[in-house]
From Swiss-Prot:
Site (described: Essential for interaction with PROZ): Y265, D318
Protein name per Swiss-Prot or TrEMBL: Protein Z-dependent protease inhibitor
Impact noted for substituting M96A: 2-fold decrease in rates of factor Xa inhibition
InterPro entries found in the cross-reference section: PZI_serpin_dom, Serpin_dom, Serpin_fam, Serpin_sf, Serpin_sf_1, Serpin_sf_2
Family to which this protein belongs: Belongs to the serpin family.
Organism in which the protein naturally occurs: Mus musculus
Signal peptide: 1-21
One GO term (biological process): liver regeneration
Native organism taxonomy: Eukaryota, Metazoa, Chordata, Craniata, Vertebrata
Length: 448
């Protein structure tokens, strides 16, 4: 797989100082010289048994490093939780406008918005922090959020089996100057790629932007824009490519056409994959839904949420929270099962700026936006659009996306089955960080 050029590839250099401590016995010549030079009458026992200062420094450094690791771990967990909460809130906003298939990346959008937040001040910045649910984390320091996202991206980029790459573009009108401080920070933490463009020549601008996106997404997103407003000053685009391979693939020879119930009255035929084996799952008695884990290589997982009854899938979205998902995960068991799962492909594009406004991020998209950390020309600047397009393809080998203790099995018994033959939700996350990569629902597997 070709790695996109804008993917951040970190290089970490750690310098370790080795300080040797000497243990001198009283019989050694060195010890004799040393002991004779001491004033025993004025020396207390504490002074005599005091540890070498260099050893104390080493111990203090190790303690500080341990505290730092513990702090970053807690902060990373909080970042993942808040990004998930942001994703669930955004799903509810999307559902108010759209009742069909859904696919988007909370992680990708959060990265893009935090990068842009580096260029904001005042109420504009506060609204972004609040809208992303990151206001508490941001209190630790002005660069804590960029640093945390950088660490997460380092984890992803170093895991080749994960098959994830993410990047961001800022298309800026040709007469717009970026402050050097912002440029350096955004490069350091996000590796964002800036493209100068003449928006007044809208057809040329559209062609250039679409060409960049085609190149970076390996042709998965061939056309992002149909038209562009010539008055535009800034367009922010982020993309996410995820080529996940199932840890245990489905056998294509078992895939057959089967019925998928769109609702109580309509049904269609879809290619239905099949596998029998050990699966991890649970059943939520309160919400009457099955939750099934489908693991990928590289420590990622698709969590499938299937309501017991066909027409109830939208009602679940009002209750999706980090705590609910964590409860599901804690109550899962692994056992032998039959799983029927449809092949599908999703391709969705969202005008995220309209959705972000509903989540309280309004000033950024208005004439009162404070982008003074981004440019000296900030008085005349506002963000015009924030777009995200995500492509997700699921087949026997796995997923291609662009934006327990084993139970005892009784011999010869028929294994239970989960048949995903009605609308369902899916959550794709990285196990180690618990970062929510993709979130969505499939209402009709035959429609993009």
């Amino acid at each position: 797989m070709r790695v996109a050029s804008s993917l951040f590839l970190p290089v970490l250099l750690t310098e370790v100082w080795l300080v040797t401590s000497f243990n001198l016995s009283s019989h050694s010549p060195e010890a004799s010289v040393h002991l004779e030079s001491q004033d025993y009458e004025n020396q207390t026992w504490e002074e005599y048994t005091r540890t070498d200062p260099r050893e104390e420094e080493e111990e203090e450094e190790e303690k500080e490093e341990g505290k730092d690791e513990e702090y970053w771990l807690r902060a990373s967990q909080q970042l993942s939780n808040e990004t998930s909460s942001f994703g669930f809130n955004l799903l509810r906003k999307i559902s108010m406008r759209h009742d069909g298939n859904v696919i988007f990346s909370p992680f990708g959008l959060s990265v893009a918005m935090v990068n842009l937040m580096l260029g904001t001040k005042g109420e504009t910045k506060v609204q972004i922090e609040n809208g992303l649910n990151l206001q508490a984390l941001s209190q630790a320091g002005p660069l804590i959020l960029p640093a945390l996202f950088k660490k997460v991206k380092e984890t992803f980029s170093s895991n080749r089996d994960l098959g994830l790459s993410q990047g961001s573009f800022a298309f800026i009108h040709k007469d717009f100057d970026i402050k050097e401080t912002y440029f350096n920070l955004s490069k350091k933490y996000f590796d964002i790629e800036y493209v100068s463009i003449n928006f007044q020549n809208s057809s040329q601008a559209r062609g250039l932007i679409n060409h960049c996106i085609v190149k970076e997404t390996e042709g998965k997103i061939p056309k992002l824009f149909d038209e562009i407003n010539p008055e535009t000053k800034l367009i922010l685009v982020d993309y996410v490519l995820f080529k996940g391979k199932w840890l245990t693939p489905f056998d294509p020879s078992f895939t057959e056409a089967d019925t998928f119930h769109l609702d109580k009255y309509r049904a269609i035929k879809v290619p239905m994959m099949y596998r029998e084996g050990n699966f991890t799952s649970t059943f939520d008695k309160k919400f009457r839904c099955h939750i099934l884990k489908l693991p990928y290589q590289g420590n990622a997982t698709m969590l499938v949420v299937l309501m017991e009854k066909t027409g109830d899938y939208l009602a679940l979205e009002d209750y999706l929270t980090v705590d609910l998902v964590e409860t599901w995960l804690q109550n899962m068991k692994t056992r032998k099962m039959e799983v029927f799962f449809p092949k599908f492909k999703l391709n969705q594009r969202y005008e995220m700026h309209e959705l972000l406004k509903q989540m309280g991020i309004r000033r950024l998209f208005s004439t009162s936006a404070d982008l003074s950390e981004l440019s000296a020309m900030a008085r005349n600047l506002q963000v015009s659009r924030v777009l995200q397009q995500s492509v997700l393809e699921v087949d026997e080998r796995g997923t291609e996306a662009v934006s327990g203790t084993l139970s005892e099995i009784i011999a010869y018994s028929m294994p239970p089955a989960i048949k995903v033959n009605r609308p369902f939700h899916f959550i794709i996350y990285e196990e180690m960080s618990r970062m929510l990569l993709f979130l969505g629902r499939v209402v009709n597997p035959t429609v993009l």
